[in-house]
Amino acid sequence: VHGKPATIDHFALIXVSYF
């Protein structure tokens, strides 16, 4: 379970994928 919202997780993943 993550301590931060799913929105932040998705943004982090996108970013990583985009970059």
Curated annotation (Swiss-Prot):
Q: Which residues lie in coiled coils?
A: none
Is this entry keyworded Mitochondrion?
yes
Q: Which family does it belong to?
A: Belongs to the cytochrome c oxidase VIII family.
What role is this protein assigned? Component of the cytochrome c oxidase, the last enzyme in the mitochondrial electron transport chain which drives oxidative phosphorylation. The respiratory chain contains 3 multisubunit complexes succinate dehydrogenase (complex II, CII), ubiquinol-cytochrome c oxidoreductase (cytochrome b-c1 complex, complex III, CIII) and cytochrome c oxidase (complex IV, CIV), that cooperate to transfer electrons derived from NADH and succinate to molecular oxygen, creating an electrochemical gradient over the inner membrane that drives transmembrane transport and the ATP synthase.
Describe the subunit structure.
Component of the cytochrome c oxidase (complex IV, CIV), a multisubunit enzyme composed of 14 subunits. The complex is composed of a catalytic core of 3 subunits MT-CO1, MT-CO2 and MT-CO3, encoded in the mitochondrial DNA, and 11 supernumerary subunits COX4I, COX5A, COX5B, COX6A, COX6B, COX6C, COX7A, COX7B, COX7C, COX8 and NDUFA4, which are encoded in the nuclear genome.
What superkingdom heads the lineage?
A: Eukaryota
Spell out the protein name for this chain: Cytochrome c oxidase subunit 8A, mitochondrial
Pathway terms, separated by semicolons: Energy metabolism; oxidative phosphorylation
> What are the protein's UniProt keywords?
Membrane, Mitochondrion, Mitochondrion inner membrane
Where does it sit, as one GO cellular component term? Answer: mitochondrial inner membrane
Q: Where is this gene product found?
A: Mitochondrion inner membrane
Where is it predominantly found? Answer: mitochondrion
What's the source species' lineage? Answer: Eukaryota, Metazoa, Chordata, Craniata, Vertebrata
Topology versus the membrane, per the UniProt entry? Answer: Single-pass membrane protein
Q: GO biological process annotations for this chain's record?
A: oxidative phosphorylation
Record organism: Thunnus obesus (Bigeye tuna)
